[in-house]
């Protein structure tokens, strides 16, 4: 074959003409100008994004979030972990409804009662001391004394007491003395019962005869959930839950190990 000449191959027949669909051209208004935005650093104003992750939160919010994460990451001993097992909502509602009937009197109510008594005494009608009505007893020291003397019928402890050391001994003491106890969500709810912002623990000492049946039912349910399960609760550790980054890192290492083992085995 002489140099410079190209070999002629067979020409492929052209494809049959495909009828092209004619697209309707969009009518563009020349008055509308395209002005694309540049979201680079120092350029256009950034679009609205969810920046929750980058917010500098107040100190108390940071602390409570860090505390919650620490409780998940670290191994939590059973004595502290038992405070995560709060009473179910239905039983807690019934308990609070009953406790609401036995709220102690406010300062204003006490003042009015004493004033009425003083007026009666001044009028010469005689001073007859009234019997103290059954009310809730609040506070760690008061409740501890009542439990030790076996005068408490039911003890209610808040789950979020800070520092937790204030009430960490109470469940063990209640079980030892045979007093039914329960852990309820919210120290503020207990505080509301006794006209304070928060309250660590409250106790029932006496109730009126019409409420004895309701209290007995509650005590039975609470005893089953807490006092009778004490040995099980005592063995149950909490926390030790890794975060998503750690889980992903461990999974990656495991995957690499499995791959290496597979190549060795062939």
UniProtKB/Swiss-Prot annotation:
There is a cross-link at residues 11, 20-21, 48, 97, 125, 245 (Glycyl lysine isopeptide (Lys-Gly) (interchain with G-Cter in SUMO2)). GO terms for molecular function: RNA binding; structural constituent of ribosome. One of its GO terms (cellular component) is cytoplasm. GO terms for biological process: cytoplasmic translation; ribosome biogenesis; translation at postsynapse; translation at presynapse. Keywords: Acetylation, Cytoplasm, Isopeptide bond, Ribonucleoprotein, Ribosomal protein, Ubl conjugation. The modification N6-acetyllysine is found at residues 34, 97, 217. Pfam families: Ribosomal_L7Ae. The keyword Kinase does not apply. The keyword GTP-binding does not apply. It is found in: Cytoplasm. Component of the large ribosomal subunit. Interacts with CRY1. Interacts with DICER1, AGO2, TARBP2, MOV10 and EIF6; they form a large RNA-induced silencing complex (RISC). Component of the large ribosomal subunit. The ribosome is a large ribonucleoprotein complex responsible for the synthesis of proteins in the cell. Belongs to the eukaryotic ribosomal protein eL8 family. This is Large ribosomal subunit protein eL8. The gene is Rpl7a.
